Amino acid sequence: MANTPSAKKAVNKIAKRTQVNKARRSRVRTFIRKFNDALAGGDKASAETAFRNCEPEIMRAVSKGVLHKNTAARKVSRLVKRLKAISA
């Protein structure tokens, strides 16, 4: 339990940041889900469009501190690999 005023403020700030970070992480997952749906549909053009929307969102999460850069690089790499597989 936070006793000092500064500790109470810190608890409130952490709760707010947690909500923001959850929203950002959810947004990334939504974009990845849209990409997966486009791939499942088999339409190369829509999959490429979904990837072009998805990749900047992942990198934005990195710049905001939600994802680690290596995690983002791994996610993007796997998405590109799957996109190329449908193209071939």
Swiss-Prot record:
Pfam families: Ribosomal_S20p
rRNA-binding in keyword set: yes
UniProt keyword annotations, A-Z: Ribonucleoprotein, Ribosomal protein, RNA-binding, rRNA-binding
Gene Ontology annotations of biological process type: translation
One annotated Gene Ontology cellular component of this protein: small ribosomal subunit
Gene Ontology molecular functions: small ribosomal subunit rRNA binding; structural constituent of ribosome
NCBIfam families, A to Z: S20
Functional description taken from the UniProt entry: Binds directly to 16S ribosomal RNA.
Protein name: Small ribosomal subunit protein bS20
